[in-house]
UniProtKB/Swiss-Prot annotation:
Family: Belongs to the terpene cyclase/mutase family.
Keywords (A to Z) from UniProt: Isomerase, Repeat
CDD domains: SQCY_1
PANTHER family: TERPENE CYCLASE/MUTASE FAMILY MEMBER, TERPENE CYCLASE_MUTASE FAMILY MEMBER
This enzyme's EC code(s): 5.4.99.-
Domain of life: Eukaryota
Organism, as annotated: Nectria sp
Listed GO MF terms: lanosterol synthase activity
Biased composition (Basic and acidic residues): 16-26
UniProt protein name: Terpene cyclase/mutase ntnI
Pathway participation: Secondary metabolite biosynthesis; terpenoid biosynthesis
Function, as annotated: Terpene cyclase/mutase; part of the gene cluster that mediates the biosynthesis of the meroterpenoids nectripenoids A and B, as well as cochliquninone D and isocochliquninone E. The pathway probably begins with the HR-PKS ntnH that catalyzes two chain-extension steps to form a reduced triketide, which then primes the SAT domain in the NR-PKS ntnG to initiate three more cycles of extension to give a linear hexaketide corresponding to the polyketide part of nectripenoids.
Region named Disordered: 1-26
Length: 734
């Protein structure tokens, strides 16, 4: 086991302490967030000399839950003062590259993929990381039953419990720890790890603690299908096809870790019966009821059975397998090259690393490159070390933060101009200036002119990020007080619009990464089990509103560029937004919780098209819906359960971020009574802290039916709502 956890290089182990649970804890004053042109990596300074030479910054202290040392501010009496106090705090968190770093965690099945990849490739796990990952997982363990869900708010399940139990054991936790005894008991009550969803079984097979017969096939031969085939992977949702590519390579090789003492012990711990007595093939379709949120269609089960019982033993030719594996390997190489070994997600990243280990060997350049970039996915907070859903959300956060600062007058305020200028420089630097190489071969859409979620190095364009990035640039470049040394020229802004226009689907809506490639009927092939909507590129209200709003802003500055096409795209987008409205007035969101989030963006898009409460039935219905959800304390509070129920579910408490969203939606729509907005802003101001910030409440974002933390939302959305109130109604005392 010790060969997998790296050695301390100094006397740093003497700096360790024990937390309230008796677990080892690192010295938080030694953690540093390295920012290399937007690439973020947490580093632990083991030597006293390093620690003294590199004092901890305000952002680092804040992320770690330490005292920032910032002064207390007088309690704000007006919305403008509250907004400016918020900007003051937010500006202190900007990193040297001009961006804002943040946590983007939530799903609990992602970290195990990365740790297993580290383990099976014999890549040393930094000891400080191992300690803090253990702390984070124990902090996220559910007290009532000892398990973990598939995301942090979810009920315990086989996927969360099996995978996170394994991670804790790989990182040195004892099987006799009372918390692991409780988790093991729960897992056995589900039937053991053989009752976990297919993706969990896959990673357990890679680790060598389950037999491959237990896993439904991941046939690389799918990649030999012509693009004309409606089920070809090129038609799938981009995350599913990218993950499938490297997973299918590993599955086809039937590769497993050779094993060590820990994995031998896990073979006995993960199951209620002896490992040698398990008929793994009989459990290929076994699934705990608690994980079966999206039952597979009978045709999918039939296809899997025919593949296992007929195709593989009798029809699968060696030459076909070799051709398929070669095609998949070329796609893996292209993905690594185009994303600079960062990958689309931690899952595809981890699987690509293992595929490179199998194909190129342990000491290869590809494995080394993966080992260097994998750190960009980890995030430290006060509870320990987690794994972000991506390598960061730098562009997304920076775009929205700078809009909030500008709304509060920061662009014209000498105190904050350097902050805004640095943010502009970051956004200018991270616009994608070309398409990927071998675009058609690797099934990538046009990205030139767009912006990514994180950085240009990762390189995946996202519609919302392109829309908000474009709006931010336009807003800043029109501010005459700013001395912008490197303005983005018109042709690059035109490229951004070209990129957006390429993304619109036949419905008028927009997806996340690309135009829909396949039929909506691909949803019949859903295999997510615990999470749904994994096969199809769907239209999303938030993506559509971001594009429609960006095109509206662009037309103000460049009214003649592709005038008819821009107007047509806006009109069709607005029609989609209206058609997506529920009969009772709400819009169902996907990437933020939920009706409150989508409602804000939808009402803004309608307003930019001249449709407000006074002249638009959709706007009136949207406002009436939002006002009906205001709580007695003046705030709004919506549970993430709205994702799954597809109806507004109340949270037990009002939420600052959702209150800001609701207030913004009402103000965008020019709701005639400012009383609900004023009540909401009073709640926001009452929760503002003495440094100018707001505390973390419920996770704000969404993925599938689960939650994601967008930890900067609580810092800039309230500012934006307060500033918008001042712009519309004046700076009255509250």
């Amino acid at each position: 086991m010790q060969s997998h956890i790296g050695q301390w290089t100094s006397t740093a182990k003497g700096h360790l302490s024990r937390d309230e649970n008796g677990d080892e804890k690192t010295d938080y004053s030694r953690w540093r967030l390295v920012d290399r042109q937007g690439r973020q990596t947490w580093r632990y300074l083991e030597s006293d000399e390093e620690n003294e030479k590199s004092p901890q910054t305000v952002p680092e202290k804040y992320f770690l839950g330490l005292d920032t040392g910032l002064p207390d501010l007088p309690k704000a009496e007006t919305p403008l003062q509250a907004a400016q106090d918020g900007v003051s705090f937010l500006s202190q968190l900007q990193l040297s590259s001009g961006q804002w770093a943040s946590e983007c965690t939530g799903p609990m099945f992602i970290l195990p993929c990365v740790i297993i990849a580290w383990y099976v490739t014999n890549t040393p796990i930094p000891p400080a990381y191992a300690i803090e990952i253990r702390r984070y997982l124990f902090a996220r363990q559910r007290v009532e039953d000892g398990g973990w869900g598939w995301h942090v708010e979810a009920r315990s399940s086989a996927i969360g419990t099996a995978l996170n139990y394994v991670v804790l054991r790989l990182l040195g936790a004892s099987k006799d720890d009372h918390r692991l005894i409780q988790a093991r008991k729960l897992l056995h009550s589900y039937g053991g790890a053989t009752y976990a969803p297919g993706i969990a079984k896959f990673w357990l097979c890679v680790l060598g603690v389950m037999k491959w017969e237990c896993v439904n096939p991941f046939l690389p031969e799918f990649w030999l299908l012509p693009d004309s085939d409606p089920t070809a992977p090129s038609k799938w949702y981009i995350h599913t096809r990218t993950n499938f590519t490297s997973l299918s390579y590993i599955w086809s090789k039937q590769w497993s870790f050779a094993g060590d003492e820990v994995t031998k012990q896990l073979q006995t711990e993960l199951y209620p019966e002896p490992y040698s007595a398990i008929d793994f093939a009989a459990h290929r379709t076994s699934l705990a009821e608690v994980d079966n949120n999206y039952p597979k269609w009978w045709l999918v089960n039939l296809m899997n059975w025919l593949t296992v019982a007929v195709y593989i033993p009798y029809m699968r030719k060696k030459a076909t397998v070799e051709s398929a594996e070669q095609r998949v390997w070329e796609l893996i190489q292209a993905e690594d090259k185009n994303s600079e070994f960062i990958g689309l997600s931690p899952i595809s990243k981890a699987a690509n690393m293992i595929a490179c280990y199998i194909h190129d060997g342990k000491d290869s350049e590809s494995v080394r490159s993966h080992g260097e970039t994998i750190f960009q996915y980890f995030w430290m907070n006060g509870e320990g070390m987690a794994c972000n859903l991506s390598d960061g959300i730098q562009v997304w956060d920076t775009s929205l933060a700078v809009q909030a600062i500008a709304a509060a007058g920061g662009a014209g305020n000498p105190r904050f101009q350097s902050t805004v200028i640095k943010a502009h420089e970051f956004l200018e630097d991270h616009q994608l200036l070309d398409d990927v190489q071998d675009q058609e071969m690797c099934c990538r859409g046009h990205r030139k002119g767009g912006w990514p979620f994180s950085t240009k190095y990762q390189g995946y364009m996202i519609s919302e990020c392109t829309g908000e990035g474009l709006r931010s640039i336009l807003q800043l470049q029109k501010t005459f007080q700013l001395d912008l040394k490197k303005r983005i020229p018109a042709d690059r802004l035109h490229n951004a619009v070209d990129c957006l226009l390429n993304l619109q689907n036949d419905t008028g809506g927009f997806g996340v990464y690309e135009k829909r490639q396949g039929s909506l009927k691909l949803a019949w092939l859903e295999m997510g089990e615990f999470s749904g909507k994994t096969m199809v590129t769907y239209d999303y209200v938030e993506c559509t509103t971001a594009v429609v709003s960006a095109l509206a802003s662009f037309s103000e500055f460049y009214p003649d560029y592709r005038k008819e096409e821009v107007q047509t795209a806006r009109t069709r987008g607005l029609e989609f937004i209206k058609s997506s409205q529920k009969p009772y007035g709400g819009w169902h969101g996907a990437w933020g919780v939920c009706f409150t989030y989508a409602g804000m963006f939808a009402l803004e898009s309608l307003a930019l098209a001249g449709e407000t409460y006074s002249n638009s039935e959709p706007s009136r219905k949207g406002c009436t819906f939002l006002v009906s959800k205001q709580r007695d304390d003046g705030g709004w509070g919506e549970s993430y359960l709205s994702f799954q129920k597809e109806e507004y579910i109340e949270h037990e408490d009002a939420q600052v971020v959702q209150t800001a969203w609701a207030c913004l939606g009402l103000m965008h729509a020019e709701y005639p009574d400012k009383t609900p907005v004023k009540r909401g802003l009073k709640l926001i101001m009452s929760r503002q802290q003495s440094k100018g910030h707001w505390l973390q409440e419920q996770y704000e974002g969404g993925v599938g039916d689960g939650v994601i933390s967008y930890s900067n939302y609580k810092l800039y959305w309230p500012v934006r709502a307060l500033a918008e109130y001042v712009r519309r109604f004046g700076n009255e005392e509250m």
